Amino acid sequence: MKADIHPNYEAVAVTCSCGNKFETRSTLGSTLAIDVCNLCHPFYTGKQKVLDTGGRVQRFADRFGMFGTKK
C-alpha cells in the first residue's frame, strides 16, 4: 500500500437524538450526530408497527383480478 494516502482512523464520540452516547472508530472526525441507535430504533425496542397490506392487496385484486381470467 502507498504511504500517507489513507485517512486517519480515530476514536469518534457518537451522540444519538435520544441522548444515548457511545464511542466507536471512524475516519469522519471527532464527533458524529445520528438520528437513531439501538436504544431507540423500533426494531430493537420491540415497538415496531406492522403495516396492514391486506387492504391494498384486495384493492389490487378487485381492480385487476379480471385480467388473469379467460372468457
UniProtKB/Swiss-Prot annotation:
InterPro entries: Ribosomal_bL28/bL31-like_sf, Ribosomal_bL31, Ribosomal_bL31_A, Ribosomal_bL31_sf. SUPFAM superfamilies: L28p-like (SSF143800). Coiled coil: none annotated. One of its GO terms (biological process) is translation. Its cofactor is Zn(2+). GO terms for molecular function: metal ion binding; rRNA binding; structural constituent of ribosome. Keywords: Metal-binding, Ribonucleoprotein, Ribosomal protein, RNA-binding, rRNA-binding, Zinc. GO terms for cellular component: ribonucleoprotein complex; ribosome. Zn(2+) binds at C16, C18, C37, C40. Binds 1 zinc ion per subunit. Transmembrane segments: none annotated. Pfam families: Ribosomal_L31. Binds the 23S rRNA. Part of the 50S ribosomal subunit. Belongs to the bacterial ribosomal protein bL31 family. Type A subfamily. PANTHER family: 50S RIBOSOMAL PROTEIN L31, CHLOROPLASTIC (PTHR33280), LARGE RIBOSOMAL SUBUNIT PROTEIN BL31A (PTHR33280:SF6). This is Large ribosomal subunit protein bL31. It comes from Pseudomonas putida (strain W619). The gene is rpmE.
